[in-house]
Design a protein with these regions (language model features):
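P-loop/Walker A NTP-binding region and its immediately flanking N-terminal helices
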Residues: 1-163, 169, 173, 183-190, ...
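Short, polar/flexible loop-turn hinges at active-site or ligand-entry regions and domain interfaces
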Residues: 175-179
């Protein structure tokens, strides 16, 4: 089975993050200084929030990532008990190697209950010297205000059409796919509304099935 293009071309360092310059500029300073605040990355799906979070971790922790970085899908582990046990244990135990702190990525945080979020606020405060949190969500309004105020908040914008055209064209070139015209790609990008991840997935589906991009769009809309 061929590798998913979204995984194959997922950026792993901050230099590969596109369209989110405010976050990248600040994150590069955090890497240099080996320090960072708690962070909330919010915005529509497919704009690179999780990839940006992991890229920050890779650049900041480097070889010390193992044993100091933990990723939790907060939509799946959304209960109060998750915070009281799993997250608290990670945040409170000793960091390894030369890492300045542990980093916990809470992905899809807008699925976590309000009680669990309030418990997380207390963990965040108590273990501030030992742990940082990176939170991603689509809807920031589902994050309680006390958590928002304890983090630097970054809006992840929809990927601009011109930038998306460059990225998708580059992927097609690397995959040796030459059958799409620029006008086809431009129509396809208009349909995506800035969701780069969906664009890469749909492009791979179209190229592997020999469907035209127009047919791929129509099929997806059914």
């Amino acid at each position: 089975m061929s590798e998913l293009w979204t995984e194959k071309y997922r950026p792993t360092t901050l230099s590969g993050i596109v369209g989110q310059s405010d976050f990248v500029l600040d994150a590069e300073h955090w890497v240099v200084n080996r320090n960072m605040p708690n962070v909330i990355l919010y915005g529509v799906a497919g704009t690179g929030k999780t990839a940006a979070a992991i890229s920050l971790v890779n650049d900041l922790l480097g070889e010390d990532k193992q044993g100091n970085f933990f990723e939790i899908n907060a939509s799946d582990d959304r209960k109060l008990e998750t915070v009281r046990t799993k997250i608290k244990e990670i945040a409170s135990t000793k960091r390894l190697g030369e890492a300045p702190f542990k980093i916990i990525l809470l992905d899809e945080m807008d699925g976590m209950t309000k009680d669990a979020q309030n418990a997380l606020k207390r963990v965040m405060e108590r273990y501030a010297d030992n742990c940082r949190f990176v939170i991603t969500c689509n809807d920031r309004h589902k994050i309680i205000l006390p958590l928002q105020s304890r983090a630097s908040n970054y809006a992840f914008n929809r990927i601009e059409s011109g930038l998306m055209l460059d990225i998708l064209s580059d992927i097609l070139a690397k995959e040796g796919v030459k059958r799409y015209t620029e006008s086809e790609l431009e129509r396809f990008i208009t349909y995506l509304s800035g969701d780069l991840r969906r664009g890469i997935n749909e492009l791979q589906a179209s190229s592997s099935s020999n469907r035209s991009l127009d047919n791929q769009i129509n099929r997806s809309l059914q």
